[in-house]
Amino acid sequence: MIRKIVITIGLVLTIGLAATAQRVALKNNLAYDAILTPNLSLEFAMGNKFTFDTQVGWNAFIFNLDAGKPNYSETKWAHWMAQPELRYWFCDVFNGWFLGLHGHVGQMNVGGIDIPFVLENKNSIMKDHRYEGWFYGGGLSVGYQWVLSTRSSLEFSLGAGYARILYDKFPCQRCGTKIDEGKANYVGPTKATISYVFFFK
């Protein structure tokens, strides 16, 4: 499954790069950095009005609570996600307002944390368990990019949409045998960017 996703993304990137001789941008989403998730994105111009963005992020960290306490547990927010987006620019590419159509796919291993509006986040149930699974979906976004120089810009965007989540449930944040499995439908915010943009050409 992962191999197929990587191959598909690679083909899309190759097509996008071949489709333009204008600009290629390398980006880092500072909003994603704020939740301690390293990320990068390549965005390719496809003519005068369209670009194709390819954000990916990966978090493999475990945030330990006080190991000396009897109720010691682990808080983890491990996941990876790919979120490609086709953008339409009202002015020129990489300048001003844009609308985006994005998809997303990823994998998670989350424990000891509440995620609003997702899964079983009722009466603090979710933070007492661990969840492993996959998610996929898509949405729409709107954003704006300020040109800082010939080589850099600053981008802001917000998006909302849908995600289908398939998960296994475990009894504690750290260990245990699977006790349940489920599916969830999420509708709400799916994208937020505060990105520094660097142009290769």
Where do the model's predicted regions map?
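Transmembrane beta-strands of outer-membrane beta-barrel pores
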Residues: 30-34, 56-62, 88, 103-109, ...
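Outer-envelope beta-barrel architecture signal
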Residues: 5, 22-26, 48-52, 93-99, ...
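Extracellular/periplasm-exposed beta-strand and loop segments of Gram-negative cell-envelope proteins
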Residues: 29, 56-81, 108-135, 163-191
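Bacterial Sec-dependent N-terminal signal peptides
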Residues: 1-24, 196, 200
